[in-house]
């Protein structure tokens, strides 16, 4: 079914509450394991329908944040999703406490019960806090989506600025950068206020649910069953020792290549004197060549991308009133992934058509899973599929960039390597924030700047506002997806492993990757790494092992 034809009707919350309540009662009164198994399967179908409805409304508002109808629907879900989650927790508790635990584990797997255990942290006390949190996230999104940045007489949104920041003319770059920074500086009070309120709301929710702070609660809500914040801190140390020095070397090399002695932050997005490699065509050109690429990559990826095109399951081009960024979601009732992005004519468009397609492909391959909980893995594992797809498609980059394909590959690898120290900065900052919920906005910004100079010691913003520690205002995950960001870095280390293996044995690596995609979320992060034949970034020396190999690979790309 095409996305535009998917019907939308606001759920009747009284009926929804009744189904949750009846399911809980049926689980409790079931006399046979087979009876409970059927109830759980029926409940899974109900949830697929319900969450598909929620996602249709979410995507349509993302495409036009001024659409009054879907804005009202979004407000409705901001109020009611916490209620739905709490009702779902009660059903989860009934299943978790089942007298037929052995039979249920045999049918659905032990991991299902680990996920249920994570859900049990919520109860009705969380509802008002989650409602407030949702409203604050929407408020942040609207400010960004409706941004108006005036540069050289033209008006841009935040998501339309990246091409300007990559311009080979340094003065042009600097002016564009200053215009973008001014938008965030003009809204400093709003961003500080929204985030301060978010931190307090989340901390109060954690206390209400019996947690010392929000960190432990959110780790549970992220279904992190294999590791805790202490393990993440050790991993950040690994990054500091391996990739921070390499990133500094890479930027030094970039400065020399550009002929710049006083390298600044606004120079980082420009990789070559004659400009970055941008795709040789518009959105239709990109989609057409992506279809050819995915058909040639494998039968599975070809079928998947044909399905996405046929059912119009992508909204790709940046435009006014559209939410910033890119994401992949799914309408599981229709077994359909969906890709949302903001194409802007840069190499980032190809990053999206591979990254978000990696998410979508995994979702497409795991739609056969019995439970909705198993269609998507936890975020740490989910980002492996997307980041790996960026590398698995390297042999086809000539389709998009022609003779500049190697420049794209260099920029992609350089960007991935230098990204990780930034990613752990964002994570470390959030741990500080929720360990110190009473810190003032000024204290938060000061701490952020300390941390970014620790992980990126050569950073020079050439701007007082950003030097005050305000860069994170533009990182939406800090506002609406706390502690998610470290997952990008963990997955990137896994994607690097697939890249190095792919260059050695394409067929075998692709087979491992597809096997991992099919597994969906049926196992925990650490177990999925085993399924995908990947070494664990947290408890092995893989980062130390691959860093010199990646440096060698980067330097070997002829540009």
Across the structure, where does each feature detected by a protein language model lie?
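A well-structured
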Residues: 1-276, 289
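Long, well-ordered alpha-helical segments
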Residues: 195-206, 211-212, 250-251, 358-368, ...
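Auxiliary, metal-adjacent structural segments of Zn-dependent hydrolase domains
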Residues: 274-334, 346-347
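Active-site recognition of the HExxH zinc-binding catalytic motif
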Residues: 341-366, 383-386, 391, 429, ...
């Amino acid at each position: 079914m095409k996305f535009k034809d998917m019907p939308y009707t606001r759920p009747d919350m009284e009926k929804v509450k009744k189904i949750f309540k009846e399911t809980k009662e049926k689980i409790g009164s079931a006399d046979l394991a087979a009876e409970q198994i059927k109830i759980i399967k029926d409940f899974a179908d109900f949830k697929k329908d319900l969450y598909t409805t929620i996602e249709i409304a979410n995507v349509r508002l993302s495409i036009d944040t001024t659409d009054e109808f879907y804005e009202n629907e979004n407000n409705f879900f901001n109020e009611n999703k916490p209620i739905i989650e709490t009702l779902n927790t009660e059903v989860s508790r009934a299943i978790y406490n089942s007298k037929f635990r052995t039979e249920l584990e045999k049918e659905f797997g032990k991991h299902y019960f680990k996920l249920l255990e994570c859900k049990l942290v919520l109860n009705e006390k969380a509802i008002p806090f989650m409602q407030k949190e949702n409203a604050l996230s929407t408020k942040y999104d609207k400010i960004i989506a409706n941004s108006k940045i005036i540069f050289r007489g033209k008006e841009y949104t935040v998501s339309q600025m990246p091409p300007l920041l990559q311009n080979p003319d340094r003065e042009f770059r600097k002016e564009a950068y200053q215009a973008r920074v001014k938008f965030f500086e003009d809204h400093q009070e709003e961003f500080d206020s929204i985030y301060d309120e978010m931190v307090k709301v989340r901390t109060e929710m954690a206390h209400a649910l019996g947690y010392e702070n929000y960190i432990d609660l959110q780790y549970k809500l992220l279904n992190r069953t294999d590791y805790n914040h202490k393990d993440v801190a050790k991993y950040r140390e690994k990054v500091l020792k391996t990739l921070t020095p390499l990133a500094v070397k890479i930027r030094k090399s970039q400065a020399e290549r550009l002929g710049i002695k006083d390298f600044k932050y606004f120079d980082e997005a420009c990789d070559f004197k004659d400009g970055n490699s941008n795709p040789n065509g518009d959105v239709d050109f990109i989609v057409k060549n992506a279809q050819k690429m995915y058909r040639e990559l494998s039968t599975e990826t070809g079928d998947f991308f044909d399905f996405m095109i046929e059912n119009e399951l992508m909204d790709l081009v940046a435009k006014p009133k559209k939410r910033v960024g890119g994401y992949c979601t799914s309408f599981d009732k229709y077994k359909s992934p969906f890709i949302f992005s903001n194409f802007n004519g840069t190499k980032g468009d190809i990053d999206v058509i591979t990254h978000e397609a990696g998410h979508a492909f995994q979702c497409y391959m795991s739609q056969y899973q019995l439970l909705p909980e198993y269609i998507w893995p936890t975020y740490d594992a989910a980002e492996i599929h997307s980041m790996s797809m960026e590398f698995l498609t390297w042999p086809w980059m000539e389709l998009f960039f022609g003779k500049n394909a190697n420049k794209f590959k260099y920029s992609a690898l350089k960007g991935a390597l230098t990204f990780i120290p930034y990613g752990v900065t964002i994570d470390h900052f959030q741990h500080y924030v929720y360990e110190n919920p009473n810190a003032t906005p000024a204290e938060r910004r000061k701490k952020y700047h300390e941390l970014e100079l620790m992980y990126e010691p050569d950073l020079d913003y050439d701007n007082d506002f950003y030097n005050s520690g305000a860069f994170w205002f533009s990182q939406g995950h800090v506002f609406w997806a706390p502690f998610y960001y470290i997952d990008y870095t963990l997955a990137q280390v896994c994607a690097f492993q697939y890249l190095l293996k792919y260059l050695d044995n394409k067929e075998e690596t692709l087979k491992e990757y597809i096997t991992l995609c099919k597994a969906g979320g049926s196992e925990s992060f650490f177990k999925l790494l085993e399924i995908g034949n990947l070494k664990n970034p947290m408890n092995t020396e893989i980062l130390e092992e691959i860093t010199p190999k990646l440096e060698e690979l980067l330097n070997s790309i002829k540009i």
